[in-house]
Amino acid sequence: MKRKVITVIFTVLLLSAVFIQPTHANSAQRHWSGTDSTGALVKDKNCPLVVDKELLTFDVQEFPKNYYNSIEEFLAYTGKVTAEYTFRNPADYTVTATLVFPFGNLPHYGEYIYDSPTDKYIAVSDTEKYGVKVNGEPIDVAVRHTLKARGTPFSLDEDMPKLTDGYISDSFFRPDLPVWVQQYSVEGIGAENQAATAAFVLREDSSKTRVLWAEKNGIATLKDGIRISGWTKTGDTLTVYIFGEPPKDGITWSLYENGACKKKIDGNITLKYSEQMTFRDFAFREYDNSSGISESDWYNAQVAFMNDGSKDWMYGGIYTEKSAFSLMRWYEYTLTLEPGQTLTNTVTAPLYPAIDAGYTPSIHTYTYLLSPAKTWAQFGELKIVVNTPYY
């Protein structure tokens, strides 16, 4: 069957004036990541549906702010992309296909917004503003979520397999895997040791034992193990999670003068609290039922996050940064076409640019990936329209 492959990246750079010049300021953030959008994908292999044409419309009537004071202010932003597909079923039988449309993570400037009444950062959901239609009528659509590092491009080979129905099966991180949470108190470090560092060494079989220290700053490879370390001071509480079998020699702490971990100093690190849970309990510690994220998508993202933190380290070490946990959103919906039938499928999604404030005026970059077109049996005409006053 004929296949037309489109693998280009369509990038729109919009400036708020014709002439730009670089600007620099010390100790100030100058770049905020946006999100990449992409086209509709078919989940089913060997699907006979073809795309006769696509109308891709970018509506950029305003630029987003790099900081929002409220959720309402962020949700008032109007940037969007609309993909209108004309699908046709050339087969002599009815085809029901499940489609997904990935539309990126929330941007840096909108993922979490400070809520002054609660003194907390609130996760934002913007998906109710958008949706999917067939022949002009809204249809049921699920919003799915998968782990995706900010600033990384969409990859069919890497991102599609993460979109799993139900709970993922993993060789190590199983729902019933035992997890111990241990909390240690730090005492007796002299005031002169401003760069005091706590550390312990792991020499475990990572297929049986893995260890995560929440407050760590670094991991160093030793001849026969790894050393996990982090800055500390008197009064600190250190939290360690042990997955699977406990380390053969437990967690044995040492205190050092600084991060080089050469000269030991006086002080005590004492176990004050220990509790056993399951990995499922661990995975859902911060799950919010009102977030719109399904339990299975959240769990699968946690498994992927922990595996990403384990893959570069031997001897049972896990290195993760809580701030690096970010989710990409997908629309998932079903189309049914009778033999020879043609229909119009319209998908509208938010459009968030990357912002580079290192120039005056700032540069806003909108990226839309066309490579998913290669998942279709045939892809015909593509028309791109940009509606904006900034040209």
Predicted regions and their residues:
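Lumenal/extracellular ectodomains and adaptor appendage modules
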Residues: P22-Y391
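Bacterial N-terminal signal peptides that target proteins for export
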Residues: M1-I9
